[in-house]
């Protein structure tokens, strides 16, 4: 066990560190939810949720399965989620979103890059830092493992300059070394981020604030 940990730390030392370019915003408050409730038909998902996001916050959104965590993230990102209450978003707020599901990934990586207007060199460089073999770039996305698909979504977000990063279970299917790279990245660049993650150690290390649903 000690040998494995020592090997992992050595690998982390040799692994290239990830980079991020969070954008500053001209006011400290980016977003506010006041008494927000979400229901799908007669099924209530969450009720009377209130919190604010200030610049520099790293907020862990926590709650049981089915408590509305993903719905809150999607609502903030502008998806058509039925809700009551008040959601105030700062004007021209740029958000970078990593969804929980990888289901939408299809076609070739080159098509994904073009579709999302990504810098190809930067995007592929990030994937290489995530230990992607070069031959993987030529395969279809639906041939990727779940961990590789999640890395594609994370690499896209790391390419994007944003005021607010919203990540839904970013560590799902991710190997231990990449988890450590992601943790180091967030502690170094300190982006404003709202995230859902079941890894309690990650939440404890990263979050400056916790919101319970």
Question: Where are the model-predicted features located?
Answer:
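Coupling and communication elements adjacent to P-loop NTPase active sites across diverse families
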Residues: 1-44, 54
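Conserved hydrophobic segment flanking the Walker A/P-loop of ABC-type ATPase nucleotide-binding domains
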Residues: 51-54, 61
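ABC ATPase nucleotide-binding domain signature region
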Residues: 58, 64, 71-123, 197, ...
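ABC-family nucleotide-binding domains
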Residues: 65, 168, 174-175, 179
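ABC-family P-loop ATPase nucleotide-binding domains
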Residues: 100-156, 160-163, 169-172
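Conserved H-loop
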Residues: 191-196
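A short, surface-exposed alpha-helical micro-motif characterized by mixed small hydrophobic
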Residues: 203-205
């Amino acid at each position: 066990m000690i040998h494995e940990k020592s090997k992992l730390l050595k690998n982390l030392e040799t692994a290239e560190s990830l980079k991020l370019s969070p954008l500053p915003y001209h006011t400290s408050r980016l977003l506010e939810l006041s008494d927000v409730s979400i229901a799908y038909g007669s099924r209530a998902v969450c009720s009377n949720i209130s919190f604010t996001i200030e610049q520099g916050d790293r907020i862990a959104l926590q709650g049981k399965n089915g408590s509305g965590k993903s719905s809150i993230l999607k609502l903030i990102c502008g998806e058509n989620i039925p809700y009551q209450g008040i959601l105030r978003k700062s004007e021209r707020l740029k958000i970078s979103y990593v969804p929980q599901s990888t289901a939408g990934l299809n076609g070739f990586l080159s098509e994904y890059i073009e579709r999302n207007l990504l810098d190809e060199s930067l995007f592929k460089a990030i994937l290489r830092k995530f230990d992607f073999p070069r031959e993987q770039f030529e395969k279809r996305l639906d041939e990727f493992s779940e961990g590789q698909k999640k890395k594609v979504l994370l690499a896209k977000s790391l390419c994007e300059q944003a005021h607010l990063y919203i990540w839904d279970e970013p560590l799902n299917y991710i190997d231990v070394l990449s988890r450590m790279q992601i943790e180091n990245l967030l502690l170094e660049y300190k982006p404003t981020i709202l995230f859902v993650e079941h890894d309690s150690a990650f939440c404890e290390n990263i979050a400056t604030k916790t919101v319970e649903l």
